[in-house]
Amino acid sequence: VGTSAVDLGPRLAVALAALTVLAAAAGRLSGLGQDRPVAVAAVRATVQLAAVSAVLLVVVRSLVLSALFVLLMVGVAAVTAAGRATGLALRSAGAARRVGTAAVPVLVGAVPVVGLVLAGGTVPLRGEAVVPVAGILVGGAMTATSLAGRRLREELAVRRGEVEAALALGLVRRDAVHEVLRPAAATALVPPLDQTRTVGLVTLPGAFVGVLLGGGTPVQAGATQLLVLLGLLAAQVTAVWTTVELAARGRLLPDVPR
């Protein structure tokens, strides 16, 4: 099978510009007021991916540099998850503690899965393989942590009285939070579960398309996508579980009743 990689030329630039204009126009004409955020996001993504692509040309040649790059991704993921989960700005007091706490579910979700696929030889121990796989899993764990933390925070704001009532009945904080808030955190798993259930029927996700565009066979693409999907599911379920436990112990959200 020959390569079907995207052509890097003027036509790509025109297509990207047209897609950005389409998204921005829809954001404006719909009344959502998202035209500027869409344009900024598109420019930012272009700059970031260009920079990352240039860096990765060097990074993936060395396992040490690849590991350092993965650590950088974890750091960015922790900062993002901390902000989304707590709703507090990075510049506010206690930011370092919140970022450190948010890094825990990201690491607990991603590290075992990365270790498993590397130890089993499914993914070769080379930079060009480790970085993208680790990036996908870290990103998935980050999203799960952000969504679970945000849902816990929103649910706590609405059902705070129920948590306090459970505490008044003699439950310890961990059990009270589990009883009242844990079901809300489970909604963070709806996107990965839906994606896994409908893969091949409704969607052809990124890994599948990437392998095909890179010249792989449909069987190779399917096997790669299955590995990614199940790895993501494991990482995200573990990340949500860890997020709930941290919140129940008062380490993630600042105002959980005691």
Question: Would you name each region that the model predicts?
Answer:
Residues 11-16, 66-69, 86-90, 97-147:
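Loop-to-helix entry region at the N-terminal start of transmembrane alpha-helices
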Residues 6-20, 61-75:
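Structural signature of hydrophobic alpha-helical transmembrane segments
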Residues 33-60, 64-71:
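Loop-to-helix transition at the N-terminal end of transmembrane alpha-helices
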Residues 151-188:
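Short cytoplasmic-facing helical segments at TM-TM junctions of multi-pass membrane proteins
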Residues 50, 64-86, 95:
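Active-site cofactor/substrate anionic-group-binding motifs, chiefly glycine-
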Residues 24-25, 53-55, 78-79, 111-115, ...:
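Alpha-helical transmembrane segments of multipass membrane proteins
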Residues 23-36, 78-91:
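C-terminal ends of transmembrane helices
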Residues 179-258:
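Transmembrane alpha-helix interface motif
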